[in-house]
Amino acid sequence: MANTIGKMFSVTSFGSSHGKAVGAVIDGCPANLELNTEDIQKELDKRKPGTSGVTTPRKEEDKVQILSGIFEGKTDGTPITGVVYNNNQHSKDYSMFKNTPRPSHGDYGWMSKYGNYDYNGGGRGSGRITIGHVIAGAIAKKLLKTKNIEIVSQVIQIGDIMAHSNDFDTVKENVEKNSVRCGDLEAAKAMEELILSKKQEGDSIGGIVETVAVGVPAGLGEPVFERLDGDLARILMNINAVKGVEIGFGFDVATSCASEINDEYYIEDNKIYTSTNSSGGIIGGISNGMPIISRIAVKPTPSISKCQKSVNLEKMEAEDITIQGRHDPCICPRATVVAQSSVAIVLADHMIRSGYIHPSNLEI
C-alpha cells in the first residue's frame, strides 16, 4: 500500500477513520523554520467536521499534537510527526456494511485487494485521512511563505451554480466569510441553499474547487517525467472524491485555437510575464513564474440516506441499503484546504529540488 508522496519534502500518511488516530510524518523539511502547533491547528480547523450545516455533523476537535521535529519553536531538520486522535466514532453505523459494499465507495475494491478490510467509517479510505494532508500542507505553506509564495483555494461551483471570478486578495478574504468557502459572496449564498436543499432530500451534490498559487518562480518541474503539472495532477487525484483535474484552461483547450489561448510574453521592470495565463503557470512541465492555477472536480458524497441497490457478498444476493450515519451533503467546502495543502506539498518539494530552498538549513 502506497502511503508516501514527495522526493525531498516527503509526506507519509497514517491512520484510519475509526482507529485510534490519524496523522502524517513529514521528512525533508529544513531546519530553522519557525513553526508551532497553532500554525497547523488553524489549517485543521478549516477541514474539521461539524462546523456548519453544509458539513457532516460528526463532532471532532481535531486537535493536533506534534510528537517530533520541532525544538525551541523551530524545525530541527528531523522528521515532523503530527497526530490527531479520533474521539467521536460511531462504528455501529457501519456494521451492516461488513459484507455489503456501499455504492460508489471504495469498499468493494478494498475487499477484493486486501481481504481484511476495516469497513468502519471507510477505514483507511475515509476522507478523514486527509488530516495528514493538511498537517503536512500547513508546514509546506509556512515553508513557502519564506519565499513569498501564497496559495488560496475556493469553491467555484456547486451543482450548476458558478462563482464569478475575483482577484487573489478578494478571494483570500472572502473565503473566510462563508461556510461554503467561496470567493464570491453572492454565489456562496446560493450554493449554501442548494447544499442544504440536497441535505433535506437525503442526497448530496458535487462541485469544483480552484487553487491558485502566486509568487512561484520560473523553473520548477522537469520536462518529461516529474513535470510540475504531472505531480500536481497526481497529488490532487489522490484526494478522496476527486474525479478530474485541470491546470489552467484545462479541457477548454480542446475547443480553442492557438491564436486564442497562446500566452504571449512581455517585459516589465526587467521581468518576464505573459499577457494571459491559459497554461495556468506551467508550460512544458516547468513553471513560468505566472500564478499556478488548478481545479478539481469533486463528486457528490456517495453516503446518502436514499435507498440504493447493492449486493451481499456473503450470501451472494441482491440487497437494498440505506446509509445512516453522519455525512457531508457536499464535501467541497472542506476539500478546499485539502487541495490547498496538496498543492503546497508539491511546490515545497519542487522548491527544494530546484535549489530555491536549502534542503537542510533555512539560515544558510
Swiss-Prot record:
Q: Give a yes or no for keyword Acyltransferase in this entry.
A: no
The record, for NCBIfam families, names: aroC, PRK05382.1
List its EC numbers.
4.2.3.5
Q: Which family does it belong to?
A: Belongs to the chorismate synthase family.
> Where do the TM regions start and end?
none
Cellular-component GO terms for this entry: cytosol
HAMAP family xrefs: Chorismate_synth
Q: Which domain of life is it from?
A: Archaea
Listed name of the protein: Chorismate synthase
Pathway given in the UniProt record: Metabolic intermediate biosynthesis; chorismate biosynthesis; chorismate from D-erythrose 4-phosphate and phosphoenolpyruvate: step 7/7
Reaction catalysed by this enzyme: 5-O-(1-carboxyvinyl)-3-phosphoshikimate = chorismate + phosphate
| Cofactor(s), names only, from the UniProt record | FMNH2
What is this protein's function?
A: This reaction introduces a second double bond into the aromatic ring system.
Name any one GO molecular function. Answer: FMN binding
Cofactor info, note text: Reduced FMN (FMNH(2)).
Supply the Gene3D superfamilies for this chain: Chorismate synthase AroC
Protein keywords: Amino-acid biosynthesis, Aromatic amino acid biosynthesis, FAD, Flavoprotein, FMN, Lyase, NADP
Listed binding positions for FMN are 124-126, 240-241, 284, 299-303, 326
Where do the annotations place NADP(+) binding? Answer: 47
**What is a biological process (GO) this protein takes part in?**
chorismate biosynthetic process
Tell me the classification of the organism that encodes this protein. Answer: Archaea, Methanobacteriati, Methanobacteriota, Methanomada group, Methanobacteria
